[in-house]
Swiss-Prot record:
Binding locations of Mg(2+) 2: 112, 115, 277
Record's protein name: Fructose-1,6-bisphosphatase class 1
Gene: fbp
Coiled coil: none
Subunit structure: Homotetramer.
């Protein structure tokens, strides 16, 4: 069975001019996944469950594991000579690695260190999301905000780690999506899902229907469409919502479906973050044959205006996302 290390080396060999910098970053993320996997698996036995008593930049209560994952990822990336800077959902501003090797590095990382962390107390799957870009500021100087404010179509790699019944690392470098399952008996990620493809049609819709009254009219119509009986389109669809973006998306990637986190009266711009969640998930979806929009526009074409910008997200099987967008367009003001 092929390991993640072997896979990375093989892919690097396909590019004669590659210097191994991106491979080095992916190796750091592999190590990070092992560390977080270890601590999540013993979370109930150590004092890292529950709230930390601190709020993040969005005014949300940080869980202890949020801070642990954030600090672990920051430390792992600071140790890499390929990384010039880092931005996290948990920090108000980006972090420039202002050392000689940091100033001469080519890549920056954006991350949601622990997505769905509010679920960890009840043993529900959580995940880590990451996004990698080439910096646009001059090499030899510290990174700037401009380096992090790039549209998603400029990503060179993106992925997630899902910590569930097994731990999986799924990533793309723009040449398909591959998944690796962690074997704790040998401490290695092994290729388990090669060239992952999202079904064009799906039967699962994932949305928090408890917020139904706050949703736009187009979303309400699409929910009703999913619930209607129609043999020709295999409806009604199945409602499955975990409340952890990584876990919901991972299931729909494998089985086919749509994940929706729309705007709402209490979140007029949506709740998910464009740079930390929207862009990397959209990149993965498209590389697997899926579609990702904000209800009207392709996610990867949105020009960011703020580091913690929020965005509605409709992502999943092509036919389902297009149908939802059609209904959103119908009620567009």
């Amino acid at each position: 069975m092929k390991t993640l290390s072997e896979f990375i080396v093989e892919r690097q060999a396909e590019y004669p001019n590659a210097k191994g910098e991106l491979s080095g970053i992916l190796s750091s993320i592999r190590l990070l996944a092992k560390i977080i996997h270890r601590d999540i698996n013993k979370a109930g036995l150590t004092n890292i469950l529950g709230q930390s008593g601190i709020e993040n930049v969005q005014g949300e209560s940080q869980m202890k594991l949020d801070l642990f994952a954030h600090n672990t990822m920051k430390a792992a990336l600071m140790a890499r000579e390929e990384v010039a800077g880092f931005a996290s959902e948990e920090e108000e501003s980006f972090i420039a690695f202002d050392t000689e090797r940091g100033r001469n590095a080519k890549y920056i990382i954006l991350t949601d260190p622990l997505d769905g962390s509010s679920n960890i107390d009840v043993n529900v799957s959580v995940g880590t999301i990451f996004s990698i870009y080439r910096r646009v500021s001059p090499i030899g100087s510290p990174v700037t905000l401009e380096d992090f404010m790039q549209p998603g179509n400029k990503q060179v790699a993106a992925g997630y780690i899902v910590y569930g019944s097994s731990t999986m690392l799924v990533y793309t470098t723009g040449n398909g999506v591959n998944g690796f399952t962690y074997d704790p008996s040998i401490g290695t990620f092994c290729l388990s899902h090669e060239n992952m493809q999202m079904p064009k049609e799906g039967k699962i819709y994932s949305i928090n229907e408890g917020q139904y009254l706050k949703f736009p009219q187009g979303v309400k119509k699409y929910i009703k469409y999913c619930q209607e009986e129609d043999k020709a389109t295999h409806r009604p669809y199945v409602s499955r919502y975990i409340g952890s973006l990584v876990a919901d998306f991972h299931r729909n990637l494998l089985k086919g479906g749509i994940y929706i986190y729309p705007s709402a009266t209490n979140y007029p711009n949506g709740k998910l973050r464009l740079l930390y969640e929207g862009n990397p998930i959209a990149f993965l979806a498209e590389q697997a044959g899926g579609v990702a929009t904000d209800g009207y526009r392709r996610i990867l074409d949105i020009e960011p205006t703020a580091l913690h910008e929020r965005v509605p997200l409709f992502v999943g099987s092509e036919d389902m996302v297009k149908k939802a967008q059609e209904m959103m367009e119908e009620f567009k003001e």
